[in-house]
From Swiss-Prot:
Compartment(s): Cytoplasm
Entry similarity comment: Belongs to the glutamate 5-kinase family.
Protein name: Glutamate 5-kinase
The protein's enzyme class: transferase
Positions contributing to substrate binding: S56, D143, N155
């Protein structure tokens, strides 16, 4: 770790929603905001940081171009509008960045692009190479090609996956409020700001995020930002929520982050007992004393506890085609420090239809004395795996010892249902 006096350089992802870039009523671009964002990103680059933008707005710009007031309902129409708008949107970014002689690159992703491990690594290598070349990658979901079943869902999720993909230090989620509140500040004047969240896995007691379903031109809301924060912090990425119409504050917040020691954040995380109240008071006084703009920071899991590259890919890059229900003993064996692979003896039930090496959810159930699944025991989804066997093969060998596989199937492709490198569980 660098000394406190040394300048720290970060990899920073900035996510901008459609409502940050396009007026919800007129559908006109917010060129002033875009210009401020460009100035901020250029300044961050000059400070030595690497920056990636995740930019929504292609569909919104397409609606404006085609003089349409509402988002179409049919998928083909939406994809056509996205194709029209995406070119114009990247053109605006290019024009603004060119005023500073800053080069950009467009990266359009679909979930299909990262379903394969080799493609996932290729995407990772491409973005990192662009950063090393001093280029600003501008990432968006390819709404022209992606289908509903395998979409990222929203660009909050895409920004979290992008952050994990490149091992970013910080993810900034820009929105229409300056931070997370205990309630909607527009409708509840008593809503209190939440400035730091040490551990999202412990929940957010006293915080109501319902009702923030996103704008007319976008798909996100506060709940999707919390999902993104959970994904990113589990991958070791600090995540921040801040107001989009003051993008210059990103630089001020980054300068503040440079003064912090890693131990300071770890101490806050370790001392956190689920009570947010006192913590917010201390954080508010600290930000006020240093004249740091309001924002919410979700502290990332440390290096020992965050998801590694392949684990994150399995959990969040792959789409589950079914589920494998295991007993509690198998789960304990899979999650200990030197975890083992999943053996057929630990499998109680198989759900859905899937092929070899497709992704499945791992669920924990209770085994009855006859070896079948207890229907009264609530199943808990605990992770994901890439299976060495199809669902029909696994149905035949579930509960058996590995040396019985060949007798049952006539062949033995592997003693494991899933090898340990093809298993992933969220940090506990």
């Amino acid at each position: 770790m660098k000394d406190a006096n040394e300048s720290k350089s970060y990899t920073i992802v900035i996510k901008l929603g459609s409502s940050s870039l396009v007026d919800e009523k007129t559908k006109e671009p917010k060129l002033a905001i875009m210009s401020l964002i460009v100035e901020t990103v250029v300044k961050l680059r000059r400070m030595g940081h690497k920056v990636i933008i995740v930019s929504s707005g292609g569909i919104a710009v397409g609606l404006r171009t085609m003089r349409m007031n509402k988002r179409p309902k049919h998928l083909a129409e939406v994809q056509a509008i996205a194709a029209i708008g995406q070119g114009r949107l990247i053109g605006r970014w290019d024009l603004l960045f060119s005023q500073f002689d800053q080069r950009i690159a467009q990266i359009l992703l679909t979930r299909n692009d990262i379903l394969d491990w080799t493609q996932y690594k290729n995407a990772q290598n491409t973005i990192n190479e662009l950063l090393n070349m001093g280029v600003i990658p501008i990432v968006n979901e390819n709404d022209t090609l992606s289908v509903r079943e395998i979409k990222f869902g929203d660009n909050d999720t895409l920004s979290a996956i992008t952050s994990a993909l490149i091992h970013a230090d910080y993810l900034f989620l820009l929105t229409d409020v300056d931070c997370l509140y205990t309630d909607n500040p527009r409708t509840n004047p008593d809503a209190m700001p939440i400035l730091v969240v040490p551990d999202l896995s412990k929940g957010l007691p006293g915080v109501n995020t319902a009702g923030g379903s996103g704008s007319d031109v976008g798909t996100g809301g506060m709940e999707t930002k919390l999902v993104a924060a959970d994904l990113a912090t589990n991958a070791g990425v600090h995540t921040l929520i801040m107001k989009s119409d003051t993008p210059a504050n990103i630089g001020r917040i980054v300068e503040y982050m440079q003064t912090l020691e890693l131990d300071d954040e770890n101490k806050v995380k370790q001392a956190y007992n689920g009570d947010l109240t006192d913590l917010q008071k201390r954080e508010f006084e600290k930000l006020k004393a240093l004249n740091v703009p309001l924002h919410t920071k979700f502290i990332a899991n440390d290096n020992k506890h965050h998801l590694k590259n392949r684990e994150f890919w399995i959990l969040h890059g792959l789409v589950s085609k079914g589920a494998v229900v295991i007993d509690q003993g198998a789960y304990a064996a899979l999650t200990r420090k030197n975890k083992a692979g999943l053996l057929p003896a630990g499998v109680i039930d198989v759900q859905g239809t899937f092929h070899e090496l497709e992704c499945v959810d791992i669920k924990v159930g209770k085994k009855l004395p006859d070896g079948t699944l207890d229907p009264d025991f609530p199943l808990q989804t605990v992770g994901k795996a890439r299976c060495n066997y199809t669902s029909s093969e696994l149905t035949k060998i579930k509960g058996l010892h590995s040396d019985q596989i060949e007798e049952e199937l006539g062949y033995n492709d592997s003693e494991y249902v899933a090898h340990r490198e093809n298993l992933a569980f969220p940090p506990r």
